[in-house]
Structures are given as C-alpha cells and as structure tokens.
Amino acid sequence: MSIEDIGSEQAYVSALYDRLDELRRRTTTRLRGVLRQHESLPRARFERDAASADCAATLARIRAAENGLCFGRLDFDDGERRYIGRLGIFDEAADYEPLLIDWRTPAARPFYAATGAVRLGVRRRRHIATRRRDVTGLEDDVFETGSRAPGAAPGSTPAELVGEPALFATLNAARTGRMSDIVATIQTEQDRIIRSDHRGVLVVQGGPGTGKTAVALHRAAYLLYTHRDRLARSGVLVVGPHQAFLRYIENVLPSLGETSVVSATVEVLYPGVTVRRAEEPAVAELKGRAGLADVIAAAVRDRQRLPVGQTFEIHTEERLLLLERSTCARARALARESGELHNDARAIFVRAVIDALARQVADGYAAETITAQVLEADPAAFDLLAPAGSGGTSLLDDDDLAQLRQELRADPAVQAALAELWPILSPDQLVAELYADPGTLAAAAPRLTAAERRLLHRPLAEDDPDPDDDWLRELRAATAPTAAGDTGAGVGAAGETAGADAPAPDGARPRPRPMGGWTAADIPLLDEAAELLGDDDQAARAAALRERVARVAYAQGVLDILSRDIEDDPEIMMATDLIDATRLADRHEDADLRTVAERALADRTWTFGHVVVDEAQELSEMAWRMVMRRCPTRSMTIVGDVAQTSDPAGTTSWERVLAPYPAVGAPARRETLTVNYRTPAEIMAVAADVLATLRPPQQPPRSVREVGERPWRLRVDAADLGAQVGQAVLAELARLAPGPVGSPTAGGSGGGRLAVLVPAGRIAELTAAVRAVVPTAESGPGAALTATVVVLGVREAKGLEFDTVLIADPDTLLTESARGAHDLYVALTRSTRTLGVLHTADVPPMLARLSPADAPRTRPAPPGDASAAAPGPTTDSDPAAGTAPASTSPTASSAPGT
C-alpha cells in the first residue's frame, strides 16, 4: 500500500479521534455539572444519579473505542464510502452525516458479509490497522480479483474468508491469556449468527476453534445495541463453564463498550451458597438427572405432614389441646389447593389449624361455664351434663376470639406442633436433611435404586463453621436490645408486618449443609427447592433490618439535636411535634442505585432479557432447568460442541436439551460453525480420528491454515513420565521465546504460553515434575490465564487455548472417566501451533497419525507459502533421553476461532 494511501487514511482517522475527544470533553463537563447538583427530594436525587450513571456509561463506551476506533472502509460501486468502527460518530455541522459507522448497524453489515460471489454492491473492502492513534497498515479486498493469503490451508478462497491478510496477521500473534474482541475480523458465517433475530432459542454447534465464544459475545454486544431499551432494564446473562473461562473472556464486552452484562457460572446464579468441594462423577451424573426435580418435589410434600395418630396432643401451660388428624388434613388440602409455594402456603395451613384450636378452646370455656352454673344450682345433675368441649354456644365475641388466636399463635407448644406438621423451610435445610436421612430419601425417591440413594446420602455438617452464615450474626446484632428511647417503635412496627409466622431472630440458626459443604451439582437442586419453597429471605431481612435500625437511630439523633435547646419551653413547637424518627428516616431512604448486573446477581428470581450459554454441552438437565427459569421469554443463544462434552451429566444431543421446553415466540433454530481458526490442519487431522470414535458422529471443522509442523508423540517409561514431561517442557519453552529457561522472561510477553494437560489424578505429581525444571510453572485454573507454563486437567482447560500443548498419559485420560475420548479430543484441540503427546504404553490407535518424536517435525514449505516453518535446525529427539525436538516457528493469537 502506498505512503499516500496511508497518509490519507491517517488524516481521516486523526479527525475521528479529534471528534472522539470532543465527545469525551462534553460528556465529562455534563457529568461534573450533574455531580454538583444537591438535591433533597428522593425523586430529584434519583434523576440526578440516573443522569450520572448515563454519563459514566457514555464515557466507558468512549474509553472502549480508544483502541482500534476505526478498522475498516467500504467503497461501493456508486462511489459511496463508509468507514466502520467501534461506535458511531456524526458530523453535527453536516446534518449529522455519519463519519464513522458502528459495526453493529445494518449499514456496516457489508463489511462482514460481502464476498466475491455476493458483493452487496461493494467494490473494495479496506482493513485499517492502527496502533494507538497511528495508522500502521492497510489491506484491501478487491472483489474482482483476489488470491489465497499466505498460510491459508488448501481450499480457502476470498469468497470463504473475509479479509484474509488481516485475519492471518491476527492468527499469527502469540497468546496472552486473555481473549480479545474480533470486531475487525468477523467472518461471514459468524456475522450471520451474530445478527440473527433475538427471539427464540438459537443453538450454535461448532467444533473447536470455530469462534463459538467470540460469536456469542459479539452477539450479546449486537443485541444490546439493537435492543438497548429492553435489555438495559432486564440485562443479558452470559453463563460460562468455570471462573477461569469467565476471566479469560472478561475484557471482550468492555472493549466493545458494553459493561452491563452479567457473567456467571451456574453455581453463582444461586446467591448465598459457596461451592466447597468437587463432586464424584457418579454422584454428579445422578444429581444432574431431570428426575431429581421429582425427588425435590416429593421431599417438599413429605414435610407437609399429618399427625401419626387420630389426634395430636399439644400441652400448653394452661390446657391440653387435641388436634385431630382430620382437621390437619382439611387444613393441608386447603393450603395445597391455594397454589402458593410451601412457605407461603403455610400461612393458610396455620390459619386453619389456629381457627380450629381457637374454637376448641372457646367451646371449652363455654362448657366449663355451663358446668359450673349447673353444678352450683344442682350438684346431682353432674351425670346429665354433656362432655366438656362437645360444643355449645360460645361465650366469646369476635374480639375475644381474635385475642385467643393471637395467644395460641404465640404459644411455644403450638408453634412447635405447627413446625412439626408444616415447617418453614429453606432450600438448604430441605436438601441437606434429605441427603442426611435414608428414610426420607427412600420416601422421596422410590424410583431410584438403593445403590443410587446411597450415592446421595451425606450426613449433616455439625460443628465446622460456614462463612456463608455471616447473615446470622448480622441478624442477631441488628435485633439486639437497645437503650430506652432508641428505635424500638420503628423496628417493632417493621417486625409486626412480618407476621406471627415469621421466625424470631433468637430462633434463627445456621443453615444446614452436608458434611464437607455443597458441590456444583447441588446448586440446581437448591434452586429447584427454592422454586417450590419460596426464597429463604432471612439474610435479606437481616440486612434490611440492620439498615433500618441505623437509619432510624441517625434520624433520632438529628431530632434530639434540634430539640436540645428548647425542650423545656412548652410554647415553642419542636421538630418532634411534627415528625418522629421513623417517618424522618423513611423520607430519606435511598433509591436502589445498583447496576442491573449487581441487582441481578443478588436476586435469585431475576429474569434476563437474553441469556448466552457457552460450553453449553456441559450443563446437566437440572442445570438447564435452572438456566431456563432465568429467561422465561426463551431469548437465548446456546453455543457448544457435543463432541467436547466432559461432564458426566452433560449432553450429547441438543434436541434432548430443548425437548422439555416449549418454544416461546419463535421456534428454536440451529446454526453450525464449520471453519476452525485456532487449530492447525496438521493437529486437526489427528483430532479428527478421535472425533470419528465419538457418538453421535460429528463433522470435523475445516482448519483455515497449516503451520508446517507435525504434531509428535514420544513413548516413555511409566516410572520416568514426570522427568520426561519436564524435559519436553524445557525444549518447547525454549522455542517460545528467548531467555533463561525457568526465568520470568522465558516465554514471556510476545512469546506465547505452554500448557501441560494431564489426567485429573496426576495433576499434583506432574506439576511437581514440571516445577523441578521450570520453577515458575503454575497449576490449576487460577493460574491458567497468567502463567507462561501451566499444568491443568483437561476440564480446567475447557474453552481456553495455548500456543503449545503437551499431553501426558493419554491412556489414563481415556479411561479415567466415561467421557475419556471426549476429554482427549478437547486436549488435542487446545493448541494453536505445537502439539506433543507423551505416552507410556502403545500409542492408542486413534492417535496413530502422530509422528514419532525422532521423525522430522517440519515439512518443506510449498512454493510461495511464507507462513510455513522457516528453514532452521530440526534436531531429532533422543527417545531414551525423552527430549522433544527443537525448531523455530511463530505462534498464534486470539482470533475468530476463540
């Protein structure tokens, strides 16, 4: 590209940045003016804070557009020219003529959709590369001509790939541990999915490296732009497989100017409970079955009990009450027929029982009074009296009966009886006690085998404290006795509105939990229980009560100060004559200014306007029930690959996932991503052999590039596996970047990252072996994004990618779980360039395409293919020493295949 072209584009880009700076100055000035406003009325404060939030969001979008503001240009046959970028910029002096078009608008679509076969009126598409605010390069796609880009695999043509030079430049950068946006290199099949209708469920099936995650995130940004009024209120939820994955993608949406999306794993969607341990695969599979929903429902009904005998004796301090089984049966039927959730329906049950007991006591009063009057007149008439309590005219009026019902409701013996027959339950209590009691399990789960029920059985935790019980300490602190004249009146009023059935603070107790704590597989069961019980709101009430106590106390202090100097003068009206502390506090109650994301994560019942589920094949049937509740409109984007399912409770069929959920608004539809941008063709050929063994059969994605390097295998002695892995790491790390091996600079910035993927049972052992030669090596998902060398289990690497991958002990990977072949397929496809496999037995037949380590690893570069491995030393490894061969080659970076 000529210097004149670059200079011309630089002038235009500089003008765009000048306009961006002006927008930033205007918004900053407006924000300062808003923040200087001092409003006293709640409504005015709310409007001020809303304006402030709007300015802050605008500034965030401006900051996000700073890097790569303008990345493309379209020249049309009719002479029209459009510049494409991260946000829209307009010329106010020219009737708001667009200077830069937001990539999400319909006007920008030809930038991604135009091909040599379907030009859409586009004559030339220009990709503009920038560094900070400087134009560094231009690449043109002229649709009348074109040639395959260097490094493209055979079969790729300009009609299939958009902007090949820009795309391959992106692919050939080293991985950084964070995913970046692909807004400048979105491909045609990806763009079609990103812009598809928001209504209904969209399933995107795509093999490794096809860009499922990138498509899902850019679709979220597109929908927020297109339907902002609706989605800004309800929010967009992105569900990922694990926290390391969420950290991996966390910069993508902010870089696109979107900061209001909620990103969470399934277990985070149930607030207040922390996962403490991993679940055994067999137990996780069992807990993930849809049939467990029936078990939870049966457990709830089992806690709505009737007396064992015909009567239930209640010994109060004053009398013996007899509660008949038939009375309880009528009360239970009435409560169940109401359709209310368990804890809400309890009020109906309690009311019916209390009414029956009150009538019994009233009849007893009447009988006692009549008996006393008759015997006083004629003692010989005792045998003629009807049995006490058999009925008669009540001597109590309505007010007396109301008072009697209140007394019965407050009586400890009556409360204990009601708690036994129809207790207030939290989801934690219901599920933990279900696990702990074999008899309850047998009654609730008759369709499970005895062996399956034993898998679910887990004793209750007794003494180990749980950090999640901080709410209990807050509740007790908030309701501790205060000095006379404090906030008793206001707090008392709040307490009365809770109803007599609400548990007293002194009766609150830590939430039951299984021994060892909850697992990720328990979370959907807790959510299911919450749907049937109603939320346990003790923690929320504790926080609200604590806040109210503080607010009323502060208001009382203000009134005391205002009245201090004039309280002895009866002729002067004081503030306390007009308002009390409670009303003053209520007038200054703050509006809820939390963001949509903050409110959504704190509210289990929140429903989202759109939900994106990534690595969706890993969700169990119970987890799907949980996710579907968050989006009753079924506006969802589901992305995954059923060939990569690792979770024992995951799915291998999208049809099976969606079958229980009727379509809402629009039928479910399916798209397939077919192009692999991450995995080189040499590695994908090996992975395709593994894919061929899986059921149901899947078509492997087509890789767009070759790297000129064959994936290798090395057989080692089982006893020497750790040492051989360490030597292989040293050899491969030396190829990533210069610097002393094991130093922070080895494989550092610009060099790329290396992962050793191992069986779950050998992580500790092989991590120690790698650290023996590379002290800076890390292990576990917490280090998966930051360490140059990291040792991971396959499931910890799901959704991530690395420049170099070494797989240790594939035989154990294949046998340690029921989905071992799926795990091996995932492991093989994490690499963007180099793959090595170290095995201790005969190589599995499905890995037969791997080249022996003592064979040359690079192939001659085809004529004109500059991206193939550069000439250089290709040292063969010594199988006895276990050293992998060394060669020089470039690495790869985040691109459309992430």
Model region roles, listed by residue range:
Residues 279-368:
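ATP-hydrolysis module of ASCE/P-loop NTPase motor domains
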Residues 2-38, 42, 131, 150, ...:
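P-loop NTPase Walker
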Residues 22, 26-33, 144, 258, ...:
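Intrinsically disordered or highly flexible coil/loop and linker segments, enriched in small
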